[in-house]
Amino acid sequence: MAYLLQNGRPVLASPISSGRYGHLTKGGSFKILEKERTHYSSMYGRIVDARGNTIVADADADMPVPPGGKFIPAPMHYFMRFCGADGMHAGYLPGYPASHGCVRMPEQYAIAFFNSVGVGTPVSVFGRTSAGRYYSDRSQSAFLRRPRFGPPIGPRLAPPPPPWWR
């Protein structure tokens, strides 16, 4: 979960997908270094053939591209960089850590966070990523039994951000 704090209290909670095994999201204390509403990855994306069909869905920019094909950078809208190439942005949440190190969140929450923070806003990243692709039910249950900010707010229970955050 990502929490937006105001005066030390959580005012918004968003489900996230963080860095997968081998591309863990770096933990620590950071600050927002840059904000970009429409950002594209310079390192990751997909490769399409001459007809536009995806032939490599999780491609690195330095992978060979077939004749007539091209590399299409991954969109990272509402990007808030906080450490090197890592940041928070709108993206797909499969229910487990799946990114290359960034913190993905649903677009409505990314917009709310983006509109609420400025360059220099503190960011704290903590927690662990499971060694496997999916979190086990046991580790999810253990996390839910030990909430750090009171009862967790699941994506189905959390109301969408108010219109003034957009």
Range-by-range predicted roles:
Residues G8, K35-E36, A85, Q108:
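Short loop segments at secondary-structure junctions
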Residues H39-R46:
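Short acidic, Gly/Pro-enriched loop/turn segments at secondary-structure junctions
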